[in-house]
């Protein structure tokens, strides 16, 4: 008798792009369908950009100011996209290193993570995004890169898939890729 895996929240890593919007909408739909909180994460050092080592020589107070500014932008942008759905939380993470990401994304709860799959050779947290998804401890769904219906599931997300309440017309089996 295998325990049905559950999750406590849906996590989404902010990305201002077409695929980022698709991923947010998917995360929002999953939150609504499962009556779960949607956590929107923003990293001061973008985990999608594996060349980025910005903010290294900023002072602590400058980083704090930047974080506050980013969080404001984040709230404005995604509150509007979330519409009536109010169970949305925002969290700014300071570093895009693997450990910080892990700490930030696994904060106190087991989350289903939804990420924008921006392009075939996209990176996330310093490794190819499919490799990241495959190795990550939580269930991960990638959205994109070509259309919003194109979802890729890691092995942990596959176990959740039947109970997620995803709109069947929108996600045909053919679009679902197992990493």
Give a label for each model feature:
Residues 3-57, 135, 144-146, 158-179:
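Small/aliphatic-rich secondary-structure junction motif
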Residues 58-72:
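A short acidic, glycine-rich active-site loop
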Residues 20, 71, 94-95, 122:
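A conditional alpha-helix N-cap/helix-loop micro-motif detector
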Residues 105-106, 154-160:
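Short, surface-exposed amphipathic charged segments that create phosphate/polyanion-binding patches used
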Residues 112-136, 146-151:
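Glycine-rich, Arg-bearing micro-motifs that act as flexible, cationic patches
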Residues 39-41, 89-93, 141-143:
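General small-molecule cofactor/ligand-binding pocket signal
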Residues 2-5, 80-113, 118-121, 165-179:
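Structural beta-alpha unit
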Residues 22-26, 100-104, 127-131:
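A short acidic, amphipathic alpha-helical/loop segment
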